[in-house]
């Protein structure tokens, strides 16, 4: 993990074979560099740009892949955030503290969903609400699925997000929710198949977060 030059390595068997994009750098030193950059500079615009697909790549923390691959721990990260709060100047505290608190709440949210799959691992392959089993899987359209994966649905915003994700291995949370809900409701694709593809694509794939959100955005909870 610590010696990796990319997150994850392009030859990782779990990653789709035709990956040809450019993912963020990995490694311990890179994890420390980007969190320092976030806490000292970028966090001041965190909430304002959190959901913007064009700006989130810069203003989000971008630490999620490092948490996934273990180049920084949650305990260490929380300590760095709390230290930053304590050392804010009076001027910084006016706006920065709110952004830091929002970031901390999302770290707590991450832990919550990881615990959720620990308590109920079946959510990886079973609908949380059993009534919705067989809702979509029996009418799966392979052509729709391929077009969605490749960013060729004909819906410009959806396709742009998918192509960006395929290239970078990362996209902001709101856009993840959008591409999943589009696949589930507009294309009527089963969440298990779209979810597996996304799990192969996200460099910060974390099963607990992934499957809980996938099911909620597909309306099977």
State what each model feature region is.
Residues 1, 89, 163, 209-213:
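Trp/Phe/Arg-rich N-terminal binding region typifying the photolyase-homology
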Residues 1-130:
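Glycine/tryptophan-enriched, flexible segments
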Residues 14, 56-59, 78, 136-142, ...:
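Short acidic (Asp/Glu) and glycine-rich catalytic loops that position anionic groups and cofactors
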Residues 108, 113-167, 171, 178:
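A contiguous catalytic/ligand-binding core that recognizes phosphate-bearing ligands
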Residues 118-130, 190-198, 210-213:
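Short acidic alpha-helical/loop segments enriched in Asp/Glu that coordinate divalent cations
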């Amino acid at each position: 993990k610590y010696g990796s030059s990319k997150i994850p390595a392009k030859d990782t068997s779990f990653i789709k074979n035709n990956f040809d994009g450019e993912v963020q750098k990995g490694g311990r030193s890179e994890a420390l560099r980007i969190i320092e950059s976030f806490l000292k500079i970028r966090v001041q615009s965190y909430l304002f740009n959190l959901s913007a697909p064009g700006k989130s790549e810069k203003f989000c923390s971008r630490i999620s892949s490092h948490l996934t691959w273990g180049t920084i721990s949650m305990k260490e990260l929380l300590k760095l955030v709390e230290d930053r709060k304590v050392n804010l100047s009076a001027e910084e505290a006016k706006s920065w503290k709110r952004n830091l608190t929002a970031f901390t709440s999302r770290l707590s949210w991450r832990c919550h969903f990881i615990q959720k799959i620990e308590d109920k691992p079946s959510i990886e392959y079973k609908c949380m609400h059993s009534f919705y089993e067989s809702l979509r899987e029996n009418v799966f359209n392979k052509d729709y699925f391929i077009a969605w994966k490749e960013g060729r649905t004909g819906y410009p915003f959806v396709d742009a997000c998918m192509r960006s994700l395929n290239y970078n291995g990362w996209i902001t949370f709101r856009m993840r929710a959008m591409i999943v809900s589009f696949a589930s409701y507009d294309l009527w694709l089963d969440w298990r198949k779209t979810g597996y593809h996304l799990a192969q694509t996200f460099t910060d794939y974390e099963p607990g977060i992934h499957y809980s959100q996938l099911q909620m955005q597909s309306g099977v909870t």
